[in-house]
Every structure is written in structure tokens, then in C-alpha cells.
Amino acid sequence: MNPRRKKRLTIILAISAGLAAVIGLVLYALSQNIDLFYTPSELVEGKGPDKIKPEEGQRLRIGGLVVPGSVQRDPQSLKVAFKLVDNGGHLVTVEFDGILPDLFREGQGIVAQGTLKDATTVAAFEVLAKHDENYMPPEVADATNGMHFKPEYTEAQLKGSKQ
């Protein structure tokens, strides 16, 4: 092999090795962020066999059932805090500053998108409620595994809705 071909082969192999290393590092860095959906149990315990937990400040989506009696509204603003649960029994607090969807109720499935504040608190910038009484996002349906709570209303709530 003459020196010119040897030099070309060396350059091509070096570029190929560098490109493979860059692609490998990018895929490794993205491996923890490919799946953004978490259930309350996965958020607390970690996801997958490696028990990978999201970092504080990371954007994510979390889905579960709103715990009855956990909704707390700030009377001075639109801030709302509520707890989510799944079949693992872990609770995660979701804080949201905005108008909740009309179909948002305690005991119903929701998906919230936001950032992780601490190990069990998500600051949501979007809250999605389920469509109708039969629809539940597949991710939430798998996570809750039939743990749907039927909403219970007080007499005052029932009378207030008929006005």
C-alpha cells in the first residue's frame, strides 16, 4: 500500500471512529430523557431496572389519579395544589398556576406536564383531564390499573350545580 492510500485510510478511520464516539455519547446522554412519562411510583422509586430518577428541574409528564380531598386552592390567585396516586400507593404533589380543565375532578385521571421541583413535587405548566367518563390515556390506564375513584359530591355541591 502506497503512503498516499495509507494516509487516506487513516483519515477515514479516524473520522469514522470520531463520528461513532460522538453518536454513542449523544445516545447515552439522551437515554435517560427519551421517556418523559412517569407515574407517581416511578417518580419516587425510580424507573426501569436501573431505578433511574429524573433530576430536579427536568421537564416531564406525570399521570395518575387525583386523590379525593387533596385539592387545595389559593383564594387570592389561580394557584392549585393536588396529589396524584397510582397503584403503587406513592403520592406526588402537583402545583399548578392557571385555570384547570373543566373535566378536572377529584378521583379522575389526569396528565400534568411540568418540571420536577423536588423528589415528590412537580410544578406543572399544563394539566390535561380525561375526555369523558370512558376515556383514559393509555399511559394512565396502565399506571392506575383500574384504581378509578368514583367522584362523591356533597349536597351543597349538587345543589350548586343545578343553579
Swiss-Prot record:
One of its GO terms (biological process) is cytochrome complex assembly. Gene3D superfamilies: Nucleic acid-binding proteins (2.40.50.140). InterPro entries: CcmE, CcmE-like_sf, NA-bd_OB-fold. It comes from the Bacteria. It holds the Pfam family CcmE. The chain crosses the membrane at residues 9-29. Its main location: membrane. GO terms for cellular component: plasma membrane. Keywords: Cell inner membrane, Cell membrane, Cytochrome c-type biogenesis, Heme, Iron, Membrane, Metal-binding, Signal-anchor, Transmembrane, Transmembrane helix. Heme binds at residues 131, 135. It is a single-pass type II membrane protein. Residues 30-163 are periplasmic. GO terms for molecular function: heme binding; metal ion binding. Residues 1-8 are cytoplasmic. It is found in: Cell inner membrane. Heme chaperone required for the biogenesis of c-type cytochromes. Transiently binds heme delivered by CcmC and transfers the heme to apo-cytochromes in a process facilitated by CcmF and CcmH. This is Cytochrome c-type biogenesis protein CcmE.
